[in-house]
Curated annotation (Swiss-Prot):
One of its GO terms (molecular function) is oxidoreductase activity, acting on NAD(P)H as acceptor. Keywords: Flavoprotein, FMN, NAD, Oxidoreductase. Quinone reductase that provides resistance to thiol-specific stress caused by electrophilic quinones. Also exhibits azoreductase activity. Catalyzes the reductive cleavage of the azo bond in aromatic azo compounds to the corresponding amines. This is FMN-dependent NADH:quinone oxidoreductase. It is an enzyme of class 1 (oxidoreductase). Belongs to the azoreductase type 1 family. It comes from Malacoplasma penetrans (strain HF-2). Homodimer.
Length: 212
């Protein structure tokens, strides 16, 4: 039995959120394959940590046990992560950024100690990660705003194995503007079902400290 951590980083009301519908659909299909897996949901709107932004006044105390170590340990305790995030002003959401700032900690999720070339080595190489992203514009309209690739590179930096992301794009263009989240996500249903089945089939690997 695997432990699956579902991280939600959308600030939009759940009833009208494309990210919420995409995530719920994916988890539903995942559980059809692995009904006994343990699912842990982390809604970043509901935890104080994700409301705290790194700045000059809190730098000394930002990486503490409650806000940082707890969530790093959580990542080490699970086998798979689903990270759901909409594009917000050409970037990841503010809560997603706050979360990542708390867990991207040297010698805890990545390290330069064991590198022979001087680059960082990720310490979460047990994790498999599925990114579920949404955006109003079609992919490529704003090349500087590829939040999906931003997330993919960030999780890979921590050593995780990121499978092919699912991006639901173009939700705000005229032909899609009047579609509900359910209607728009229905158009990706076959892809979601397939990727959820593939993700469910990945092995559950326990975290181990990197051997020196």
């Amino acid at each position: 039995m695997a432990k699956l951590l579902v991280i939600k980083a959308s600030m939009v009301d759940k009833s009208i959120s494309f990210s919420e519908e995409l995530t719920n659909r994916f988890v539903k299909y995942y559980l059809e394959s692995n009904p006994n897996d343990e699912v842990i949901t982390l809604d970043l709107n509901e935890v104080p940590m994700a409301q705290k932004t790194l700045n000059g006044s809190n730098l000394k105390n930002f990486f503490n046990q409650e806000d940082s170590d707890f969530y790093i340990d959580q990542l080490k305790s699970v086998h798979k992560v689903i990270f759901s995030c909409p594009m917000t002003n050409f970037n990841i959401s503010a809560t997603a950024k706050n979360y990542l700032d708390h867990v991207l900690v040297a010698n805890k999720t990545f390290s330069y100690k064991y590198s022979k070339k001087g680059d960082a080595i990720g310490l979460l190489n047990h994790l498999s990660v599925q990114l579920l992203t949404t955006q109003g514009a079609p992919l490529g309209w704003y090349p500087w705003g590829n939040h999906t690739e931003n997330l993919k590179g960030t999780f890979e930096f921590m050593g995780t194995k990121v499978v092919t992301p699912i991006l639901v794009d173009g939700t705000k263009i005229p032909e899609n503007a009047n579609k509900t989240p359910v209607e728009r996500i229905n158009e990706f249903d076959s892809v979601i079902r397939l990727k959820a089945k593939e993700f469910a089939a990945l092995p559950a690997v326990d975290w181990k400290p990197l051997e020196q």
